Each structure stands twice: as structure tokens, then as C-alpha cells.
A protein has these predicted regions:
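Beta-lactam-recognizing serine transpeptidase/beta-lactamase-like catalytic domain environment
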Residues: 1-4, 13, 39-84, 89-313, ...
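Short alpha-helical functional segments enriched in proximate histidine and acidic residues
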Residues: 28-31, 142, 338
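Flexible helix-coil linker/hinge segments at domain or subdomain boundaries
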Residues: 334-344
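Solvent-exposed, charged/polar functional surfaces in cytosolic regulatory/catalytic domains
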Residues: 24-27, 252, 256, 334
Length: 350
């Protein structure tokens, strides 16, 4: 039998993007004395993984550096409650299920909502708010009221359609699906918490994939890390019109008064959402936090989906907007320049 030449294996990872992402997250972990940090970047149009980094990391050529906690690819092996980064998808579900439209106003009351024996609180009072304002001010009550107006299956169905609760398809060792709730009976507070990112857990790669689907105007593109041309398994999972509405709302979060204003990149339209979730521990929640920023750029025609996670930052500064967002901005700025994405000078919303 004649010998066959081996085929070359080419990754979609861009070495330049990998380098700026690793440098930024390594610095952030050191600055905030955090336990770990992760970054994943996807090409919105193709689903290609452009960068995937973790800190602490290790040098595979140096065996003395091989410690298990350094060798985990946390982007796929670690699942966590997504906190407020999930809120754009609640608004998307409300639009898709006809319980809200672009002009809907939600009355969030005095900032405290009683549900049975529990309470849902907002960090800042928003009163009667548009969908855009609910996202901009990250109102827990706003998304709770939207979630209560649709069957729980409708919200979970949308979460599932953008990739939550499913393996990414990258076929990398150690990947987990996260924890996706499947109960048959839901209390009001359980329905509320899944709307602001508690009660389910997802991986960083799933979060990036969901944002990429939003940026691709509702077209779900399977993600891949090995270059290959023989794939077109994309499918439209939400309407283009509703995805565009949510994208434009997401942009307001990086503008003045928004929780992700430190994720902005000068000259570009950026849409991003921050999240801060308390870590689950035996019997409840601990005093440790995970901070996130997830988003897209440029909003005019999204090219890059990016998720930045800083795990257990120490000190008084533990919000996603102040810990993860500056890292997001630094990486996104470098990536847009490296990929020669033209600035948005004339495309800003009036």
C-alpha cells in the first residue's frame, strides 16, 4: 500500500489576537489578584475561534510548569452562572414571543419586587423604562417582568437555540455543557432568577457563541477551531429584525450612563453587557464573585464577539463594569485594528 502524506492541520486561532488577549488577561488577573481569567473571541460571520486564552497558563515545553490548575482550558471546562450578561436574550425572547415590541415600557416600581416570600431588587432605580433602558441600567425587575409574561419554556427555548446547555461542537477534551434547568414546576422566584442569570450555568464559549449569534442577526453558525471549507450548517434561530433591535439596545450600554461604558472603543460602535455573579458554594452563595463583559463590534456590521471573565477578583472592586470591561476594551481595540476593521466614524446612531 502506497504511503499517504499526512494532511496539514490549520487552526482558526489568529496568533496576533491570541497574543494580545493573553497579555491583557494575564495583567488583569495580576492587577486584581484574581484566581483566574479567560478570554474567548469568535468571528461572528463564520463561527471561527480567533482567540482562546486562560490565565494562569503553562508552557507545554516545560514539564516543571505542569500543574493541573494551570492546564485547564477554562473557556470550555468551567461553567458559571452568567449573571446580567444573559439579559439581552430575555429581551430577545420577549420580542420573539410577542410579549414586547420596540416601544414597550415596563414599570419597575420602586426598585423592589415581591415574589411570594422573595424579593427581586434593582441596583439603581429606573422607574418606567423602555427595553433599551432596562438593558442599559441592567434592571433585574425589568427582565423579571418580561420573563413572567411568557411561558418559561419560551425563554428556555430561546436560551437553548443560541447554544446554552449544549456542547460547542469543538470536540475539545474536558468540555462541559453547564447546568440547564429542566424542572417541570417553577416557582415565581425561579422564573425570575433565570432571567437575570442565576439558576443556570454556562461556559464562556457558550456565552461567546450566543453573542456571535446575536451579532450575526440571529443566524446560528456552528463554531469551529480547525480550518475547513466544507460546512454550511447555519440556521436562522431568531428574526433579523429582533436581533438588530437588541444589538442597537446593547450599544447604549457602552454609552454614557450605561454599565459597560468602560468597554467602549473610541471610533467604533461597540455593544456590550457586563455581569457580576456571586459564586455558588455548598448550601448557598459565597463572598467570591465572577465578573464578565460580553459583547460585539462594530455594531453597524458585527465582526467580532468577545467574552472576558475575571474570576474572584480581590478588593472592593468586583463589578464586571470595572474589572472585566477595561480588559474587553483593550482586546477589542487591538483586534479591530489587527483585522483592519474600518472605524465607524459616520455610522453612529443619531
Amino acid at each position: 500500500q502506497d504511503k499517504q502524506e499526512g494532511k496539514s492541520l490549520q487552526l482558526t486561532i489568529d496568533q496576533r489576537l491570541q497574543a494580545i488577549a493573553y497579555r491583557a488577561i494575564k495583567q488583569a488577573v495580576a492587577d486584581h489578584r484574581a484566581t483566574s481569567g479567560s478570554v474567548v473571541m469568535l468571528d461572528v460571520k463564520t463561527g471561527a475561534v480567533l482567540a482562546m486564552v486562560n490565565a494562569p497558563s503553562y508552557n507545554p515545553n516545560n514539564r516543571t510548569d505542569w500543574q493541573s490548575y494551570k492546564m485547564r482550558n477554562r473557556v470550555i471546562t468551567d461553567s458559571m452562572e452568567p449573571g446580567s450578561t444573559i439579559k439581552p436574550f430575555v429581551i430577545l425572547a420577549a420580542l420573539e414571543n410577542g410579549v414586547a415590541d420596540k416601544d414597550t415600557i415596563v414599570d419597575t416600581g420602586n426598585g423592589v419586587l415581591r415574589l411570594g416570600g422573595s424579593r427581586v431588587r434593582d441596583v439603581s432605580w429606573v422607574g418606567k423604562a423602555s427595553l433599551s433602558m432596562i438593558l442599559k441600567k441592567s434592571s433585574n425587575i425589568g427582565v423579571t417582568k418580561l420573563a413572567m409574561q411568557m411561558p418559561v419554556e419560551a425563554l428556555l427555548g430561546l436560551y437553548s437555540s443560541v447554544g446554552f446547555g449544549e456542547l460547542s461542537g469543538l470536540n475539545l477534551v474536558g468540555e462541559v455543557t453547564g447546568i440547564f434547568p429542566t424542572r417541570t414546576r417553577w416557582s415565581p422566584i425561579e422564573r425570575a432568577t433565570i432571567a437575570f442569570g442565576y439558576g443556570l450555568s454556562i461556559t464562556p464559549i457558550q456565552l461567546a457563541h450566543a453573542y456571535a449569534t446575536l451579532g450575526n442577526l440571529g443566524k446560528y453558525e456552528p463554531i469551529h477551531i480547525i480550518e475547513s471549507n466544507d460546512r454550511d450548517m447555519s440556521r436562522q434561530v431568531v428574526s433579523k429584525e429582533n436581533a438588530r433591535l437588541v444589538l442597537d439596545m446593547l450599544e447604549t450600554v457602552t454609552q454614557k450612563g450605561g454599565s459597560a461604558r468602560r468597554a467602549a472603543v473610541p471610533g467604533y460602535r461597540v455593544g456590550a453587557k457586563t455581569g457580576t455573579s456571586r459564586k455558588a458554594s455548598a448550601g448557598g452563595y459565597s463572598d467570591e464573585y465572577i465578573t464578565y463583559t460580553a459583547g460585539l463590534a462594530p455594531v453597524s456590521d458585527p465582526r467580532i464577539a468577545l467574552v472576558v471573565i475575571v474570576n474572584e477578583p480581590q478588593g472592593d472592586d468586583y463589578y464586571g463594569g470595572s474589572v472585566a470591561s477595561p480588559v474587553f476594551s483593550e482586546i477589542m481595540k487591538g483586534a479591530l485594528q489587527i483585522l483592519n476593521v474600518a472605524p465607524d466614524e459616520n455610522k453612529f446612531q443619531q
